[in-house]
Amino acid sequence: MISDSMTVEEIRLHLGLALKEKDFVVDKTGVKTIEIIGASFVADEPFIFGALNDEYIQRELEWYKSKSLFVKDIPGETPKIWQQVASSKGEINSNYGWAIWSEDNYAQYDMCLAELGQNPDSRRGIMIYTRPSMQFDYNKDGMSDFMCTNTVQYLIRDKKINAVVNMRSNDVVFGFRNDYAWQKYVLDKLVSDLNAGDSTRQYKAGSIIWNVGSLHVYSRHFYLVDHWWKTGETHISKKDYVGKYA
């Protein structure tokens, strides 16, 4: 059975209440946020607030597939946030494709695929993204990139492959939607690759359970939460928003 976790809609409610009650947390840069500590929910929708940016999601996926640790290799214009967190050489830690496919990180995808292929009931089907040396690697050569995803565990139950995502930190608006798209891609690929290895398996993608140490909304996106609280709509452009967080 899947734990009776919260849903994305319930996460919206908790964040909406935090904003209404002005339960603010100031981050290391002095920016106001609202936050859920120890958030755990079933990721049953591809975004929480805002709207999907399919064009960027595809560009980021292509970069992940390349396994490049340099932001210049992101197809198209390099997003400002990646430029800001990169080292003086334009290098980062958080290419998630590198994290699961590179031999330098012990081929996490292949290890997980082999484990689940040999033992479908295993609790060892895990992809480890981060590493102990991240404590020092995050600020190498002027970088500011402490990987947000710790691990993703895959559990096969009742012919469904469930993903349990474990993160230290996740931005609700930009972070979640892009990370969800990546995790859905990896889950679907794992299902396909396991089925290709044995036609009798006939696995399907199950639930994605999302566990986050700090799930937060930055003040620049408070207007989205406020708009949802008033209307139930998850997105509005800032120019069309009317309210105290304009």
Swiss-Prot record:
Disulfide bonds: none annotated. One of its GO terms (molecular function) is deoxycytidylate 5-hydroxymethyltransferase activity. Its EC number is 2.1.2.8. It catalyses: dCMP + (6R)-5,10-methylene-5,6,7,8-tetrahydrofolate + H2O = 5-hydroxymethyl-dCMP + (6S)-5,6,7,8-tetrahydrofolate. The keyword S-adenosyl-L-methionine does not apply. The active site is at C148. Signal peptide: none annotated. Keywords: Transferase. InterPro entries: Deoxycytidylate_hydroxyMease, Thymidate_synth/dCMP_Mease_dom, Thymidate_synth/dCMP_Mease_sf. Belongs to the thymidylate synthase family. This is Deoxycytidylate 5-hydroxymethyltransferase. The lineage of its organism: Viruses, Duplodnaviria, Heunggongvirae, Uroviricota, Caudoviricetes.
